[in-house]
């Protein structure tokens, strides 16, 4: 902050003492437009944060899929079973999620940034400039109200120096012009900014839907192919509501093994 700006800040800090309710400027139309803008600002900042989080989540999901697929592949790895004419369904699953990660998710990274993240970020950069304009308007309002208070006091209690009132009135006129120009500009342009949000974000919204559709469709298509390698009997048992019983039988067989009870003997 410059020295001049520092002095202005100190002066404004003392305005609250001299400004009475009768001096305060009230513009309900502006207040309404500022509230609408604040709603847009909060939504825009939240959208920027969540859009970045969405991209990170896609990466996290595929990374987790790959990790668990590697574990499952090792779990199913049985050379005797494979040598006997079987196959390692875990390997097919691992290859499936690896292909999904490299051929789908990584290809979506660029389009997601270009069509969703970048436009949202660019829109959000305007918030800082608008906040500065709103802050400046508030400062000019304080100056205007203080000038009104000064004139009111000189009218109520005339000074010995007769030139003080004309000077104060001139300062009031200047403060009024500065405030009203900025106030009217914000009242005109804030609604325009708010109304532009839908046509601006529409293409990004459409792109986000298409990216989600591609992610879900490709994932479903690839994973659906793994079903042909799953045990048909287990699939039939699940469809017929018998799978829980089968699992209980397998757990019973495991419990009957001596090695499962060695730790408690």
From Swiss-Prot:
Cellular component, GO annotation: actin cortical patch; actin cytoskeleton; cytosol; mating projection; mating projection tip; medial cortex; membrane raft; Rvs161p-Rvs167p complex
Main localisation: cytoplasm
CDD domains (alphabetical): BAR_Rvs161p
Record bears the keyword Cytoplasm: yes
UniProt-listed InterPro entries: AH/BAR_dom_sf (IPR027267), BAR_dom (IPR004148), BIN3/RVS161-like (IPR046982), Rvs161/Hob3_BAR (IPR037429)
PROSITE patterns: BAR (PS51021)
Taxonomy, superkingdom: Eukaryota
Other facts noted in the record for this chain: Mutations in this gene results in sensitivity to carbon, nitrogen and sulfur starvation. Present with 7390 molecules/cell in log phase SD medium.
Functional note: Component of a cytoskeletal structure that is required for the formation of endocytic vesicles at the plasma membrane level.
Protein name: Reduced viability upon starvation protein 161
Annotated source species: Saccharomyces cerevisiae (strain ATCC 204508 / S288c) (Baker's yeast)
Gene: RVS161
